[in-house]
Every structure is written in C-alpha cells, then in structure tokens.
Amino acid sequence: MKIEQIGMAAFRQQAESGGVDEFVVQRFGGVYHLFAVNRRAGVSYFLQERRGDYKTWLSLDCAAAFLSGIGVSRFTVRFEDNKHAEKDDRGH
C-alpha cells in the first residue's frame, strides 16, 4: 500500500467525504500518529502538519478527541512497541 502525507485540511476532507475505509491511530516511539486508509485506491494517508512535521499526540485520548472532533466515530488502534503489534477497535 502506498503512503501519502497530507495536511490537516485534506485529512479532514477524507473524513467528511466517506472515501476512507479505516482510520488508524498508531503508536510509534511513545507518540500517536494518524492514518486514513483507502483500500480501493491502495493509499494510506498520513497526517502531516503544515510545516512538514508529522502531527503527533502524546496520548491516545488526545488523538481520539481529535478524530471525534472531525466526525470520526470508529477507529483502529495499533501499538508497535517491542516488536509486538496489537489491534484494538474502538468506537466512540
């Protein structure tokens, strides 16, 4: 699957358009990143801030609050610590 970095406005548009199969909150190195996955297009959109840095959250609750604020009610949580991956579907 191809990964594209997109800004906040485009990420929000993906949420509103319904063109996303899954939203993923993934933990890397102690912080949380967001992805919007479009399987039909074979693209995973990675949220990036305007200045080019990756947008991150320090807690899962903060990332969940952001997603809720843009209208996302269900997302998948993945933890990548110590080479173990866990998947947890959360609905809010």
What positions do the PLM features span?
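N-terminal start-of-chain detector that recognizes signal peptides
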Residues: 4-9, 46-51, 71, 91
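Low-complexity, intrinsically disordered regions enriched in charged/polar residues
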Residues: 2-5, 41, 66
